[in-house]
Amino acid sequence: MKGKIGFEEHFAIEDTLEQSKAFAGDGGIWNDFTREILDLNDERLEHMDKSGIELALLSLNAPGLQAILNADKALEVAKKANDAMAEAIGKYPGRYEGMAALPMHDPDVAATELTRCVHQI
């Protein structure tokens, strides 16, 4: 590998997108931000190529699961995010790796989801 590694490159899914809106401010960047943070395909890869990034280490956007108070909903969203990330990693081998999103409301549930991410997806 000769390119750069982008560490902790955030992505979002529709379920976590709204949580990031406060960080975008009122400067009119929300539409571009939305398009870019949801994308794990062509546009993101094009940006990576232009920046000399060979591999991106993906992680769910902040505050992500921590902003979801209901433990069952947090697990549901974690699974959706992890599945989306795994799909992108499989679609673009060598371009993406990822850090699992884990619902820390219950350590046993988090451990089960981590095991699923490591061994099943």
What are the language-model segments listed below?
Residues 1-121:
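Helix-coil boundary/capping segments in enzymes
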